[in-house]
């Protein structure tokens, strides 16, 4: 805009344009080409060569991946099974600090005698299990062994909008312990529920300790189209003495006779206060939920129950339209109960939640960074099956309290055709670099296919 003043001179004022906007339509996923990251990969390799590369070690970048030859030292935590020795080691890898979407899968090529257990990492210090043939135990035990490992760069999908299944129950049973809910419509499909006379019960399912309450009431008679799902809001925080805990809606369903049936639960990803009992929880609550059309966002994720009870991540807070530097590439999973690694060094944690989508995508389960205390077996989580997490540790008497972050979830193209994971497989990268064991490395996510 030009402003003339007394005809003597002009002052040009550029008012500019708004730099903030609300994105209403879903962003189409377009993975960047390998060439975008080549200089970054070369930089971290050069940095590693100058600072961390051990004597006689080598590192090079070729064919879209990093090949590292380094010394694998057995930390003498050995278990022998089927003519294989399983033990624990620690290595230092090139590290990415700045690029949130870029990850590596670290694993051994099939030409190596050593099998490093595959792991997802950003680089840096990595501690985990490896195996080698029993016949080589004498040679490896004295000095360690030089071995080649691959670092495969990949980019997961951003997590889309997440909803909870809202279905009609064919049969149901109501007991005297159910609280009552009165539904009030606020606007469109946003509802308020006033719940009274809640009766909380302790529930233990596969060692998971939660407190749960049920409620029932009359629906408003509003016809709900089939392609609708629940959007649930953030957990509600409570305190008891010096402890905090959270509760949220677990499920809400309709019944054929126009009733609404639902449940509330304490949050598994929090450490439960030791003195928390049903008597400490509220018997009167006001809840809010929204019914949304899934047609507007066809790439959404539909969970069988509220994911906020088990996971955290910026995408679960997506009701906040403008987040500061959000990370929509991963979700964090927490221990739903205390995990004791004695006398067994293994745990299989099963979480009663499933997901589905309109495509064949899956979630990749991997270990949460933990300074070498434990590792999570990398494997795909396939649709319409409960989440299972295999955790192992060679740290004797290790205890992970409820609420400890144990795993991350990454959203990937389909990696396996069945419900089998990487357990009991030969966990090596094949010659063509298209698989690890029985798990595919999809072209949509892995950058080395661009080389």
Curated annotation (Swiss-Prot):
InterPro entries: Herpes_U10. Pfam families: DUF570. Belongs to the herpesviridae U10 family. This is U10 protein. The gene is U10.
